[in-house]
Amino acid sequence: MARRDALTGKSALSGQSRSHALNATKRKWNLNLQKVRVMDENGSVFNIKVSARTLRTLKKQEKIV
């Protein structure tokens, strides 16, 4: 399973680290993924991985079990 937010589809960003001499090395900025139990409109519960930002939104909407 990819490191991707199950609800928003966000994934890691790629770029370069730059040293003081401006040497470039590839790197990734991974998401802060959390496992969460979520309830949908029908009342069924399932486990998904969401980012910390999405987790805040779910808590606000009271969708977390």
Swiss-Prot record:
Output the Gene Ontology cellular-component terms. Answer: ribonucleoprotein complex; ribosome
Q: Which Pfam families match?
A: Ribosomal_L28
Skewed-composition ranges (Polar residues): 11-22
UniProt-listed SUPFAM superfamilies: L28p-like (SSF143800)
The UniProt keywords, alphabetically, are: Ribonucleoprotein, Ribosomal protein
GO molecular-function annotation terms?
Answer: structural constituent of ribosome
Give the GO biological process terms: translation
Q: Which residue positions does the secretion signal occupy?
A: none
- The region called Disordered is annotated at 1-26
What the entry lists under InterPro entries is as follows:
Bacterial_rp_bL28, Ribosomal_bL28, Ribosomal_bL28/bL31-like_sf, Ribosomal_bL28_bact-type, Ribosomal_bL28_sf
Q: Which NCBIfam families match?
A: L28
Q: Which family does it belong to?
A: Belongs to the bacterial ribosomal protein bL28 family.
Q: What is this protein called?
A: Large ribosomal subunit protein bL28
Provenance organism: Mycoplasma capricolum subsp. capricolum (strain California kid / ATCC 27343 / NCTC 10154)
